[in-house]
Amino acid sequence: MGMSFSHLLIVLLIIFVLFGAGKLPQVMSDLAKGLKAFKDGMKDEGSDNDKKNN
């Protein structure tokens, strides 16, 4: 029950229409930075829990 290629294509088309070609690289860059910050935060949270358990 995952996303098929056609679903992904429709989502990308909607994003392209909403943001336009000019802003799309900036939006993707901001999204990547947000995901990286989230992953780093989750990794830091995991190491904090390990220290508390010892």
Curated annotation (Swiss-Prot):
Subcellular location: Cell inner membrane
Role description: Part of the twin-arginine translocation (Tat) system that transports large folded proteins containing a characteristic twin-arginine motif in their signal peptide across membranes. TatA could form the protein-conducting channel of the Tat system.
Chain coiled-coil ranges: none
Higher taxonomy: Bacteria, Pseudomonadati, Pseudomonadota, Alphaproteobacteria, Rickettsiales
Membrane spanning residue stretches: 1-21
Keywords: Cell inner membrane, Cell membrane, Membrane, Protein transport, Translocation, Transmembrane, Transmembrane helix, Transport
Listed name of the protein: Sec-independent protein translocase protein TatA
Assembly, per entry: The Tat system comprises two distinct complexes: a TatABC complex, containing multiple copies of TatA, TatB and TatC subunits, and a separate TatA complex, containing only TatA subunits. Substrates initially bind to the TatABC complex, which probably triggers association of the separate TatA complex to form the active translocon.
Keyword Transmembrane: yes
Family indicated by similarity: Belongs to the TatA/E family.
UniProt-listed GO biological process terms: protein transport by the Tat complex
A Gene Ontology cellular-component term: TAT protein transport complex
Disulfide bond residue pairs: none
Membrane topology: Single-pass membrane protein
GO MF annotations, alphabetized: protein transmembrane transporter activity
Origin species: Rickettsia felis (strain ATCC VR-1525 / URRWXCal2) (Rickettsia azadi)
Pfam family, any one: TatA_B_E
Top-rank taxon, per record: Bacteria
InterPro entries: TatA/B/E, TatA/E
